[in-house]
Regions:
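Acidic, PIN/NYN-like endoribonuclease modules and their adjacent C-terminal/linker elements
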Residues: 78, 82, 101-137
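Active-site neighborhoods of divalent-metal-dependent phosphate/nucleic-acid chemistry enzymes
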Residues: 65-108
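Residues at the C-termini of beta-strands that transition into short coil/loop
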Residues: 40, 70, 117-119
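Extended, non-globular alpha-helical segments
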Residues: 43-58, 126-136
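Short secondary-structure boundary segments
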Residues: 7, 40, 98-100
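Conserved N-terminal substructure of TIR/SEFIR domains
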Residues: 11-12
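PIN/NYN-family metal-dependent endoribonuclease catalytic core
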Residues: 4-5, 15-17, 21-50
Length: 137
């Protein structure tokens, strides 16, 4: 399963309550149970926002796949969010975000990609099995 994780998911994953949905999703990506994709522009945003967690940025660089978008999009009012849509070239199935307010990822689908909040993503068929596998270690 290919996903693009909005920066807010990674920021939420750093919160002390490490069993939150965002932390589980990051662990699924970090361990390769789901395939997370980023572009160089997204990596730059991750590094800016997660600057106080350099170890997390290093794990992302090591475990996420990089796509190189061929086109620049401008379909979302909040311009930086367009970088995440540009990763559609990686054939991602989901963009996981908490930013579903107007001007951000306010539609449920962009082309063939579904937009899901963390709790919704964990309820996608097959993801629960991956979480159980992760927790069994």
């Amino acid at each position: 399963m290919r996903v693009v994780l909005d920066t807010c998911i990674l920021k939420l994953a750093t919160f002390p309550a490490g069993n939150n949905a965002s932390a589980l999703i990051f662990e699924l990506a970090r361990t390769g149970l789901i395939e997370a994709w980023v572009s160089p522009a997204i990596l730059e945003e991750y590094a800016d926002v997660l600057g106080d967690h350099p170890e997390l940025v290093a794990e992302i660089v090591e475990s996420f796949s990089v796509c190189y978008p061929l086109t620049e999009l401008s379909v979302i009012r909040h311009e930086p969010d367009n970088r995440f849509l540009e990763c559609l070239a990686a054939s991602a199935e989901f963009i996981v975000t908490v930013n579903t307010a107007p001007g951000h990822f306010d539609r449920k689908h962009y082309q063939a990609v579904s937009v899901a909040r963390p709790g919704e993503f964990l309820n996608v068929p097959g993801v629960g099995r991956l979480v159980k596998k992760l927790l069994r270690g």
